[in-house]
Each structure stands twice: as C-alpha cells, then as structure tokens.
Swiss-Prot record:
Nacreous layer of shell (at protein level). Expressed primarily in the mantle with highest level in the mantle pallium and lower level in the mantle edge. Residues 555-558 are annotated as: Kex2-like proteinase cleavage site. InterPro entries: Chitin-bd_dom, Chitin-bd_dom_sf, ECM_Assembly_Org, VWF_A, vWFA_dom_sf. This is Protein PIF. Disulfide bonds join 298-311, 354-366. Essential component of the organic matrix for normal growth of the nacreous layer. The complex contributes to the initiation of aragonite crystallization as well as subsequent stacking of aragonite tablets in the nacreous layer. Pif80 binds to both aragonite and calcite crystals, with a higher specificity for aragonite crystals. GO terms for cellular component: extracellular region. Residues 539-563, 571-651, 802-817, 843-857, 916-995 have a biased composition (Basic and acidic residues). Residues 212-224 have a biased composition (Basic residues).
Length: 1014
C-alpha cells in the first residue's frame, strides 16, 4: 500500500518546554527524520516543515538542555542537520530543507539517526525516536522493524505517530517502544493543530523504564557481540564529540574485534577504519597469543586513510562518513580544543581555529570567551603511534606556531603574516603555504579576508613592520549612492539589489516599499564591543498627500450627508402618505380641515393626530424615525471612520531601515532568525531593538511627542529665548518675518518719535536670525552710523530697500545653492545607533535615548538588510547615506550636518561679504557727503537723492545684466507663459543633478582623506 500522507520520522533526543513540568523532561537530544520521498507532495512537505518550526519555537533548545537534529530521506539520505542547541539556526536551516525524492525507504532514515546518536549523542542523556508517518509499504516493513530493534537495543526509545485513516495499528504499535507510545492523527493538518501535545508524549516516553521487543515482527539480525575485556583506549566520539579530561564510562562499545577483521596488516600490526568517525582508527596487535586492540585519533585536521594506511589532511581524503557530505550548516564543533571546529569546504571537513580570546559555539561560530585559553592547533595532539607522522606534523605546523600568536578569520582560507601586514599566505596543497603581496596602498585584513585596509605599513625602531591601522576606526560600509551601490569605505563590500528594485539616481536610493538591499558579508561575523550605524533618509510623502486628499473628500461627503439628513429629519409624512414641511406648517396660522369628518381643527390637534394612527392604535412619532435615520447615518460614519483610522494606523506602522535578521511570512508571519539589531522609523518616532550575547534585549524609542529626551543645547537656548520674547510681547508670529515685513514695520513706526534708534537696533538684532546675511550687514551699518543723529528713518527705509535689491541681484549662485540646500534638507532625517561596551544610544536628529545591556551585540547568520526585515513594513522613501562601523568613530561621525565641502563654501561667502562691505563703505561715504550738502542746502537734498538712486539703479542694472546668464540657466520663471511648467521641470532636474554632483564629486575626491579624519 502507498502512503496517503507525509511520513516523517522524528528522532526526538530532547523534550520540549511546552507543557512540560518535570525537570526530567527538560534535557534530551532530538533528531527529526523527515520523509521527503515521492509519496509526499510539495504542499504536504511545507506543512511538515511548518510543524517542525512550531516545535522548534516551543522547545527549550539550548546546548545544556535540548539539542535538535534533523534528517530528510527518500530513496537516499537528503539534507541533514547535526545536533545543536541554537534555535534560530535550526529554524533557518529547516526552512531551506528540500525533498530528496525517490521511493520511500524509512529504514534508511532510522539508520542515519542511529549514526547521528553514535557520533554526536550526549552521554547519559535520554535518546528518543519519534516515527511519524502513514501506512508502510509491505516491502519496507521488515527493514524498518530491524532498524527500530537496533535502535531499541542501543537504548533509543521509539515513539510512533500514525498519520491517516489507512494506517495499520499493529505496524505503528510494533515500531513504538510499547503500545502506550503509539498515537494516531488524521493527517498533516491535524499534526499542525495538535503539535502542542507532542511534548507530553515525549515526557511520557522518557520516563518509561522497560523497553520491549517489537510486537509484530522480530528482527532477524544477530545480536551485537561483546568486545574483548582487554581493549585499550576508548573512542572519544562514539557517544560524544566533547572531549573532557575525566571521561565517563560508555554504556556501549564499538565492536573492535570486527574492525580488526577488516584491518590492513603491516608487520604484525593491523590498522582499521572506525565507522562514522573519519578521524579515528584502530590498531590491532598479537600480544602473547591474544589480540590487543587500541583506538587511536589522528592529529589535528587529519582523517584516517585506509588506502595509505596513515593519517592525511582532510582535503586529501574522501571519507564516506564525513558529515559535511550531508549537513547544511557550514561548520560544527571539534572536540580537541575550545577554539577548534570543523568547517565544510566543497563537501569536505577542514579544521579551523578561532582567534585567541574566542571560543567556538555550535551554530554561532566564534564568540568572545575570556575563559577559553587553550592552544589551537593543540600541541602534541597526535596519538597515532607513528613517529614518522609526528615528524611530519611538526613540519606541517611550521606556520601554525606563528599563527597561534596572531588572530585570523576561521572562515578565511588566507592567513596573515606576522610583521608583514602588506602580505598574506594561502594554502596551496601538499602542506605548502605560498606568500602573496597586497595591492599597493592596501594592507591585509583577517576579518575581511582580503587586502581591504587603506594605508601603508610603518616601521618601528627595530626595523620591523608594524600595523598601526588598528588604531584608526574606519567604516565597514559607506554607501553614498553615487556610483550605484559602490562601497566607498575601501572594503569593497558587495551589496545585493535583487531585481534592481531599489532605484539609484542623483545620489539617492529610492525604496518602493517592496524592495531592499542585502549585505551577505556580515553573516556570522562577530561585531565586537562597538557598533555604530548611521543613516540619512526621507520618507515618501506621496502617500501622505493622497491620504490627506482622501480624508478631505470623506469629510465633504459626510458633511453633505449630514445636511441631507437634516432636511430629511425636518419633513414628516401625513396620514395620506404625502410629505410636508413642518417648518412651513408651524409658520402658518390658518386652519386645517379633517378630510374624514369635514371639521376645522387646530394645528395642535392636527399635530396630535399626526402622532397617533387611529386605525392601528400605534404611535408614529416622526422623532423616532429621525432618530433611526440618524443612527443609520452614524453607523455609516463610524464604519468609514474606522476604515480611515485603520488606514492611518497602517500608515503609522513602523518601517524597517536596517536589520540583521531573516524575516518573512512563510505562513507563520514570524522571523526564522530573529534579528539582534533593528532600526525602524515612523512619522514621529524611531525605534531601536538590540539583543546581546547574554540574551539581554533592549528596546529604545525616540518619540517627538514625549518629553525627557535630550535636545541640542543651541536649539534649546533658542527656544527659550523665543519663549521669553513671546511672554514679554504677547502672542505673535513675527519671529520669521521677512525683510519686506521689517520694512513695513519701520514705515509704520517712523511717525512715532518715541521709538529711539537704539531700540530699533535691538529690534533688528532680535530678528536677524531670519536673514543672517542681510541683517548682519544692516546691523553693522546701523551701529557704524549710530553716532550720526542726522540720519532719518526715511534714509533707513531706502537703505533697506536698496540692500534688498542688492541681495536679489548679487550672488544668484549663492541664493540657488542656499535654496538647493534648504530643499535638500526638507523632510530628511538622520538616525544613528551606537553600541559601545554595553552602552546603547539611539538617536534621531536632535533627540536621543540611552540604555545599558549586558554582553555584546549578538551575531546572526543573515547579514545586514537595508530597508527590510524584522517583521515590519519595508521602507518606502529615499536614502542618502548609510554608514556601518564595528568600532567607535567618536563624536565627529555622529551628526556632521555640514561636510568638509561646506567649509569651502563658507570661505567663498566670507570673501563675498568682504567685497560687499567694501562696496558699501564707498557708497556710505557718498551718502555722508550728500548729507553734509543737505545741511547747507535743503533744495539740493532731493536732487542728490535722486542722483544717488539713479547711480544705484545703473550699477544694479549692470550687475543684473552680468548675472543674467546665470539666472537663465536655473531660473524657474520664463517670459513665455506656455513654457512655465516645462521650465520648472527642467529646473528641478537641474537642481537634483547639481546637488548630486556636488556630493558625489566631493566623495570621489576626498573620501580617503575624509575617512582618515574620522
């Protein structure tokens, strides 16, 4: 019979934390064996993976509690996950598991799980097998029973759950540990619904004491032979890969005698391989007529080669039991040192060491650990009993002795060379390491696994090269979006833009709300004690405008409906079904006839008859009808108001700016790898979420509506000053008045003789923040002329008007640049997250929030994602710059609103101001001469003023003609009315292009100097 539903074999070596109260059920090892044969459809396979993910989230997974593994099988073994205690890595790997296909052979899955228990199972920890599947094909029953009997003999408890209505109860009960450990469910959907019950099943089977043989069919395999009592040595990894000084006794031993039967004999010494342990071998010797067997382990980074009868480098031996052939994760632990681990490269295991001060943790990689001070590679690790191999091992470690004193990236095939940072070495095979030179001007970076550090090595007093670049905090990533997604940090970090969904143009990146950027380089990389991220962005305002228009239309419709309801409520029906206006009826003073009796009645009596139906005896008060109509209208209004509120709530949902977790829906609406870092943004807030290596989680929120956050001191002082002025002079809004408003104010006050010159100067000084250039010059001019009491308010008004025209005509380029900068800053926000030695600071613009956490930022294996992740909405808007540091760049990198190129512009402005001041001095001398003449002859005063005005107009006219070409290039106005829109579009594009070129030219020319300064 064929299997109607999916068949999974869960080898549960752990007990879940859901609903488990007993401490006896909290420690175990779990291997999940998944049926991926042709009997399983893709949809059913996804449901089974979903059930597995739900189990993973409910388990108390940890290296000290529950460890989980998984195997997929069809006709052969497919993807596998070794036993580990990292929940996020398990969920991430389960998601990418694929069906191997082929006929269903469940006994191969059981056999593979037995190997996993033998190689990675913990000693003295319950081992449980859960067989979950449908009806079993008759031809596979015997093999499956044989494997379950072997598992039972190895103290692996088997629990069986049958899926479907066609499963045979006897077969399921025969697989299980006993009949009480056999369960039945309708289908895969029923499994998803009842997945929370499985922890109780597991706890029950863990507490079961007496195993029994299969009830239906007994295995015909021969019982395992007991090993000889004189065996010397124990394999360090048949039940545990964790090597300790005090090794417990093993409950089961390898059949060494059988291994010696297959050994290769060389001069009365036999050498044999050990199943499932590529790095182990057995030595067999005849001693006094008896066979002495000794288990041995190859030196660090070597496997046993049966063909060569010796230990060789792992890359030179194709071991069929190498776990890298079946596992999905890139690395696993190596029990020779706390720093050692195996890395999978091209399907083979390669030994690696974590840098000093770090330890390897399964599923996490190299993590900071001050207690891990073991040597790696371990000295004297060889235990093969062969002197030649020992000699070769010394030669092999010629470079390793030097490398042990240096830190290097365990995931990098390149090694640094001590004292030569401009070089690196690479393993070329046959125990040879070849040196290579970095490109000129660069140094080798172990963390980047490339020559990515800008700089040159310096020599110390002894003549040795010393790498001082470690003292300079440089960004790991800098994206100004000038040359597409080119990284200007010098690290050449690759940034993925899938489908080119993120549009790069004019020095900005546009995110449409469905796109994002991915940076895989930071996957599995320890961030260290300091992390600094800074981003400049602007949300898309088109949605807000559309939303406001919709709200306006909704309010108009609701007002119209309210007016119609008012007219409807003011009209009533009479007994004949005709509608009349009560207001008209109330204004009339005439009499109304009753048609039935022909009598004249008063309006009040008619009103009473209108309220009572004599034929039916019921009240028909129109007020009730009106109330009913009002309730209907109110209900409609409430429904639309709720919809509008929902739209606003959706619009105010946080959008992800950057995260380092892998999150999407996948029918679970959750993250498969929870990010340890996420920055989100909303209309009025910015959110920061951080998780540490000590499982400490910190959430910060910078909200514009909340008090208690820090402000810039300058802005605070300015606000306090404006508030004092407002309290002193009353409620007014003239703080932002333009020059025209000031002229009108002076003209209005010029008749007031009580207004002194000093008061006017103070008034102008108070408002000079509105137009720094014009008002600064004006204040200087007034203070210089203040001693001359002969100047009148009329002259002052003319002077202001003249200055205003000069400002319009002079320096059109400066006005354009200023307008461009104002447009460029409009709506832009800057957000940063700084983590330094456990201190966290989240900041947006001039507000910030702080907190403290234990441990460093937790490393994830998803890399960084810009504009997406963390189970929030994708970012929709523009980004201008993105910085990522793994060090502390200092306060200079926090919020530098004006870049270095702004200094050059300021210098130019100062020169222009000096020229203007000089010109003003000459004009002032002329005016002073004119005023002296006015004292002698009042009649010539008007003529001189007219002449001065004419001269000024000529000068300004010539200046305007000179700047006419500049105005024509970027002017928004045109004499032709039909071409106004087209000119405006061209002008906008020119502004965007000029701003982009200004930024990108600066970045291209000064990025190296600029980064060194930081």
């Amino acid at each position: 019979m064929q299997v109607p539903y999916l068949q999974i074999v869960f080898l549960l070596t752990a007990v879940f934390g859901i609903g488990v109260k007993s401490d006896d059920c909290k420690t175990a090892d779990l291997v999940v064996n998944v049926d991926g044969s042709d009997d399983v459809s893709d949809r059913e396979f996804d449901k089974l993976k979903r059930a597995m993910l739900m189990l993973v989230r409910g388990l108390s997974i940890d290296d000290s509690q529950i460890r989980l593994g998984m195997v997929t099988y069809g006709s052969e073994i497919g993807d596998s996950i070794p036993l580990q205690g990292d929940r996020l890595d398990l969920a991430r790997t389960i998601r990418y598991m694929k069906k191997p296909g082929g006929p269903c052979k469940p006994f191969k899955g059981i056999g593979e799980t037995r190997k996993m228990f033998s190689s990675r199972g913990r000693f003295n920890v319950p081992h449980v097998t859960l067989n979950l599947g449908g009806d079993i094909v008759d031809s596979e029953v015997r093999d499956l029973m044989d494997e379950t009997d072997k598992a039972r003999d190895e103290d692996i408890k088997v629990m069986a759950i049958g899926l479907g209505t066609k499963v045979e109860r006897d077969e399921i009960e025969g697989i299980a540990w006993d009949k009480e450990q056999a369960y039945f469910m309708d289908d895969a959907d029923d499994l998803v619904r009842r997945v929370k019950e499985i922890p109780d099943y597991l706890c029950k089977i863990i507490k079961a004491k007496k195993p029994r043989k299969s009830a239906s069919k007994k295995s015909k395999t021969k019982p395992a032979k007991k090993p000889d009592s004189d065996i010397v040595g124990k394999s360090p990894g048949f039940h545990s890969l964790q090597r300790t000084d005090d090794k417990p006794k093993m409950s089961k031993k390898v059949e060494v005698k059988e291994l010696c039967d297959d050994a290769e004999w060389v001069e009365d010494v036999g050498y044999g391989s050990v199943p499932t342990r590529c790095e182990d071998f057995v030595m067999c010797q005849n001693v006094s007529g008896s066979l002495r067997k000794t288990l041995k382990t190859c030196p660090y980074g070597q496997f046993w080669s049966r063909a060569r009868t010796s230990c060789v480098l792992t890359e030179d031996e194709d071991c069929s039991d190498d776990l890298c052939k079946t596992m999905l994760l890139p690395s696993r632990d190596y029990d020779v040192s706390c720093r050692a681990y195996w890395k999978c490269e091209n399907g083979k295991s390669v030994a690696r060491c974590c840098p000093s001060g770090m330890a390897y943790e399964p599923g996490k990689g190299c993590v900071l650990d001050s207690d891990c001070d073991e040597e790696c590679p371990p000295k004297g690790d060889s235990d093969n009993g062969d002197d030649d191999d020992d000699d070769n091992d010394d030669d092999d470690n010629e470079y390793d002795d030097d490398d042990d004193e240096m830190e290097y990236n365990p995931n990098c095939p390149l090694r640094p060379i001590k004292g030569s940072p401009e070089k690196f070495k690479q393993h070329t095979g046959d125990d040879n390491w070849e040196e290579f030179d970095c490109a000129p001007g660069t140094l080798f970076s172990s963390r980047d696994c490339a020559c990515s550090i800008l700089g040159r090595p310096e020599k110390d007093d002894n003549g040795k090269n010393e790498d001082d670049t470690s003292k300079v905090c440089e960004p790991e990533l800098y994206l100004p979006f000038c040359d597409d997604l080119h990284d200007y940090s010098g690290k050449e970090t690759h940034v993925e833009n899938e489908g080119d969904a993120v549009i790069i143009e004019n020095g900005k990146a546009y995110f449409n709300g469905r796109a994002g950027l991915k940076i895989p380089r930071f996957s599995g990389v320890p961030y260290g004690k300091s992390v600094f991220i800074k981003m400049k962005y602007k949300e898309d305002e088109d949605d807000d405008k559309k939303r406001n228009d919709d709200d306006k239309k909704l309010r108009i419709k609701r007002d119209e409906r309210g007016r119609k309801g008012y007219r409807k409520g003011g009209r009533k029906d009479d007994r004949n079904g005709k509608r009349r206006d009560d207001r008209i009826g109330k204004r009339r003073d005439d009499r109304i006839f009753d048609d039935r009796k022909g009598r004249r009645t008063d309006d009040r009596k008619g009103d009473r008859r209108d309220r009572i139906d004599d034929r039916n005896g019921r009240r028909t008060d129109d007020r009730k009808d009106n109330r009913r109509d009002d309730r209907k209208d109110n209900r409609r209004d409430d429904i639309k108001d709720n919809k509008r509120d929902d739209k606003k709530d959706n619009a105010d949902e946080p959008m992800t700016l950057i995260s380092n977790g892998e999150c999407d829906n996948f029918e679970l609406h959750d993250c498969f790898e929870k990010p340890s870092l996420a920055i989100t943004t909303g209309k009025k807030f910015a959110g920061f979420s951080v998780s540490s290596t000590e499982r400490d989680e910190v959430d910060l929120e910078v909200d514009n509506d909340k008090k208690g956050y820090l402000w810039n001191k300058d802005k605070k002082d300015k606000d306090d000053k404006n508030r004092r002025d407002k309290d002193k002079n009353g409620d007014r809004t003239d703080d932002k008045k333009s020059l025209d408003d000031l002229v009108k104010e002076i003209e209005r006050r010029k008749s007031d003789d009580k207004k002194s010159f000093d008061d006017l100067v103070k008034e102008i000084e108070r408002r000079k923040s509105d137009d720094k250039k014009s008002f600064d010059d004006l204040v200087k001019e007034i203070e210089r002329r203040k001693s001359d009491d002969k100047i009148s308010l009329d002259d002052l008004v003319k002077e202001i008007k003249r200055r205003k025209s000069d400002d319009k005509g002079n320096g059109r380029r400066k006005d354009d640049n200023k307008n461009d900068e104002d447009d460029d800053k409009k709506g832009w926000k800057t957000v940063s997250l700084k983590i330094n030695n456990g201190h966290i600071r989240g900041r947006r613009d001039d507000r910030e929030d702080k907190d403290i956490m234990d441990g460093d930022l937790k490393t994830t294996f998803s890399g960084f994602q810009i504009g997406q992740g963390a189970s929030n909405k994708n970012f929709k808007g523009y980004m201008d710059e993105v910085y990522i540091y793994f060090c502390d760049p200092g306060k200079e990198a926090d919020f530098d609103e004006e870049d270095d190129n702004g200094d050059d512009d300021d210098d130019d402005d100062d020169d222009d101001d000096k020229d203007n001041d000089a010109g003003d001095d000459n004009k002032d001398d002329n005016n002073n001469n004119g005023r002296k003449d006015d004292n002698n002859n009042d009649g010539r005063k008007d003529d001189n003023n007219k002449k001065d005005d004419k001269d000024r107009s000529d000068k300004n006219g010539g200046k305007d003609d000179k700047d006419k070409d500049t105005k024509d290039k970027f002017s928004d106005k045109d004499n032709g009315k039909d071409n106004e829109d087209a000119d405006r579009d061209i002008n906008d594009n020119d502004k965007l292009y000029r701003r982009a070129m200004k930024k990108c030219d600066f970045v291209n020319k000064n990025v190296e100097k600029w980064l060194d300064k930081r």
